[in-house]
């Protein structure tokens, strides 16, 4: 992944969706994007209030979040880079393309459930 091109880095930089969004869309994770709202769940800044993604820095594999910043020695504040796997998305910025992706992912999950090892009828027969 050190010399992965940008379009593959996008995929690597995915974040899990919050429990509510997971229920709503039937999708587990999504590549992160600039105006998503996220909550940090690991590391020094975890548990802080929800913040908006200010920048997605693919070269460094980090995202910068609105309120996650620190003060430099000279007094200026800078954003702290956080890896996307350490946040959960609490609100998605939806446009038509992103909706399409969600529908596509949800559809493939449905297919996966139908492809399960046992159907309900066979389970009922086994219990008899």
Swiss-Prot record:
Which keywords does this chain's UniProt record carry?
Cytoplasm, Ribonucleoprotein, Ribosomal protein
Q: SMART domains, from UniProt?
A: KOW
Chain intervals for the UniProt region annotation (Disordered): 105-128
**Location in or out of the cell:** Cytoplasm
What domain of life does the native source organism fall in?
A: Eukaryota
- Disulfide-bonded cysteines: none
Question: Which BP terms in the Gene Ontology apply to this protein?
Answer: cytoplasmic translation; ribosomal large subunit biogenesis
The cross-references to Pfam families, in alphabetical order and at most eight, read: KOW (PF00467), Ribosomal_L26 (PF16906)
Q: Which GO terms describe its cellular component?
A: cytosolic large ribosomal subunit
Task: Read off the CDD domains from this record.
Answer: KOW_RPL26
Q: Could you describe the subunit structure of this protein?
A: Component of the large ribosomal subunit.
Question: In which family does this protein belong, per the annotation?
Answer: Belongs to the universal ribosomal protein uL24 family.
Say what the protein does. Answer: Component of the large ribosomal subunit. The ribosome is a large ribonucleoprotein complex responsible for the synthesis of proteins in the cell.
Q: What is this protein called?
A: Large ribosomal subunit protein uL24
Organism phylogeny: Eukaryota, Metazoa, Chordata, Craniata, Vertebrata
Q: Which gene encodes it?
A: RPL26
């Amino acid at each position: 992944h050190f010399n992965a091109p940008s379009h593959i880095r996008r995929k690597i930089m995915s974040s899990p969706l919050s429990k509510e969004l997971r229920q709503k869309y039937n999708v587990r994770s999504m590549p992160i994007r600039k105006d998503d709202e996220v909550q940090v769940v690991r590391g020094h800044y975890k548990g802080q209030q929800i913040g908006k993604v200010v920048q997605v820095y693919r070269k460094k594999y980090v995202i910068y979040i609105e309120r996650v910043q620190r003060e430099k020695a000279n007094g200026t504040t800078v954003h702290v880079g956080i890896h996307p796997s350490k946040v959960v998305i609490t609100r998605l910025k939806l446009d038509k393309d992103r909706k399409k992706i969600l529908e596509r992912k949800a559809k493939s999950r449905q297919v996966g459930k139908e492809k399960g090892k046992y159907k309900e009828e066979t389970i009922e027969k086994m219990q008899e």
